[in-house]
């Protein structure tokens, strides 16, 4: 029994060992099969790669070139975007902002124009009627009403104003002119040269100056008021002027009788003319020399035959003014009720002298009054062109302060230096 059990156990153990050995062999076979399959797969993949390399030998170079090309294209696109941004967002378009015509086209968007409604109405009125004179008058009236409204000035109810400050400025100007005229006898030399170079008739000898008095008083302006001129449709300043002074000019000449032979007789003549009083109402206004009203007024004056003799003498200056491009001018005239008083002294003859002949005095006075009326008395007026008031570098001035030489003083045994400059005060407390 025991032997049989031993044999059975031995058989069982051998079977189990056989099963284990069989299982291990099976596992080893599976592992070997898997390794073989893996090797076959690797060999298959290697063969495929070798075939691909053989069929496409330049594939790597193509991939490398496509990357470089993409990089270059990307850089170019970035540069193009930067250029477009700088051109359209940083810098302005020159063609859209710089006007082709340097005239009014470039200033239309810069200058602020007010009263657009009035301008539109004026333009519509011009298209309907085409009357430039009416357009100018309407525009001038609108400007005048705007000026009076913004300056709070009522031409009908505003009180007259004194011109004390203006009198001081005029007095300073006249005083400076007198000083310059009397400096080195400038006025004498100027008048003497004028009389010497003047064309005289054959019966008048050389004219010599005997007396010159430019006065020492000043005109007084007062009672200034602004009025609306009905004739020229503009604002005018009415100013009362009063001058009580003595302005004298004395000359001496000879009347020559050249018949029947030259210098048959000689008659000495001495004249002294003095203006002792002038008063009147002065009308002053600022105008544009290209105004239509002014041109029409000049044409009317010429048609009326005003000052034919004087017009020929003044034609050169008138032509010069007509050739100008216009500008601001000061227009002034005096009312017909002015007051002008003269004192005329005459002395005729060599031995038997005739003194203060009334006929000669009235003749000279009438000639002077006629000369004044034809130039300055309404409806005639004088136009004085004003210089440009725009600030310029060439007109800029600056006071120059010059230092005087240094002077030394001794006080209580100590020396002190003092430097003085014009317009400064020297400190005396050393």
From Swiss-Prot:
Biased composition range(s): Acidic residues: 317-326
Keywords assigned by UniProt, alphabetized: Endoplasmic reticulum, Lipid transport, Lipid-binding, Membrane, Transmembrane, Transmembrane helix, Transport
Superkingdom of this protein's organism: Eukaryota
Annotated Gene Ontology cellular component terms: endoplasmic reticulum membrane; ERMES complex
Membrane-spanning residues: 71-91
The UniProt record lists the keyword RNA-binding: no
Region (Disordered): 305-326
InterPro entries reported in the protein's UniProt record: Mmm1, MMM1_dom, SMP_LBD
Lumenal topological domain: 1-70
Pfam family membership, one: MMM1
Xref: PANTHER family: SMP-LTD DOMAIN-CONTAINING PROTEIN, TEX2 PROTEIN-RELATED
Protein name: Maintenance of mitochondrial morphology protein 1
Organism: Candida dubliniensis (strain CD36 / ATCC MYA-646 / CBS 7987 / NCPF 3949 / NRRL Y-17841)
Lineage: Eukaryota, Fungi, Dikarya, Ascomycota, Saccharomycotina
């Amino acid at each position: 029994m025991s032997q049989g059990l031993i044999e059975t156990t031995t058989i069982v153990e051998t079977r189990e060992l056989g099963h284990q050995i069989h299982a291990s062999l099976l596992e080893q076979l599976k592992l070997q099969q898997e390794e073989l399959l893996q090797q076959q797969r690797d060999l298959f993949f290697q063969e495929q790669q070798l075939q691909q390399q053989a069929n496409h030998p330049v594939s790597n170079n193509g991939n490398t070139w496509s990357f470089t090309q993409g990089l270059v294209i990307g850089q170019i696109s970035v540069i193009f975007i930067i250029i477009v941004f700088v051109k359209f967002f940083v810098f302005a378009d020159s063609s859209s902002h710089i006007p082709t015509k340097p005239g009014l086209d470039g200033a239309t968007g810069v200058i602020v124009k007010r009263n657009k409604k009035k301008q539109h109405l004026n333009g519509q009125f011009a298209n309907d009627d085409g009357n430039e004179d009416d357009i100018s008058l309407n525009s001038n009236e609108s400007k005048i009403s705007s000026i009076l409204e913004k300056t709070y000035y009522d031409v009908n109810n505003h009180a007259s104003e004194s011109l004390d400050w203006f009198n001081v400025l005029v007095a300073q100007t006249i005083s400076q002119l007198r000083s310059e005229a009397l400096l080195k006898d400038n006025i004498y030399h100027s008048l003497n040269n004028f009389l010497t170079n003047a064309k005289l008739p054959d019966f008048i000898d050389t004219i010599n100056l005997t007396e010159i008095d430019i006065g020492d008083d000043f005109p007084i302006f007062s009672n200034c008021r602004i009025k609306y001129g009905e004739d020229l449709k503009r604002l005018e300043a009415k100013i009362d002027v009063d001058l009580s002074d003595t302005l004298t000019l004395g000359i001496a000449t000879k009347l020559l009788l050249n018949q029947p032979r030259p210098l048959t007789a000689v008659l000495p003549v001495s004249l002294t003319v003095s203006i002792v009083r002038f008063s009147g109402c002065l009308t002053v206004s600022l105008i544009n020399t290209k105004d239509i009203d002014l041109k029409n007024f000049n044409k009317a004056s010429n048609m009326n035959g005003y000052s034919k003799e004087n017009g020929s003498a003044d034609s050169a200056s008138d032509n010069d003014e007509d050739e100008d491009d216009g500008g601001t001018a000061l227009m002034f005239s005096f009312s017909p009720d002015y007051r002008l008083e003269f004192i005329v002294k005459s002395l005729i003859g060599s031995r038997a002298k005739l003194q203060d002949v009334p006929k000669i005095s009235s003749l000279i006075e009438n000639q002077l009054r006629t000369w004044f009326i034809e130039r300055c008395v309404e409806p005639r007026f004088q136009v004085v062109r004003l210089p440009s008031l725009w600030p310029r570098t060439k007109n800029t001035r600056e006071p120059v302060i010059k230092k005087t030489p240094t002077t030394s003083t001794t006080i209580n045994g100590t020396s002190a230096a003092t430097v003085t400059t014009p317009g400064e005060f020297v400190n005396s407390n050393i």
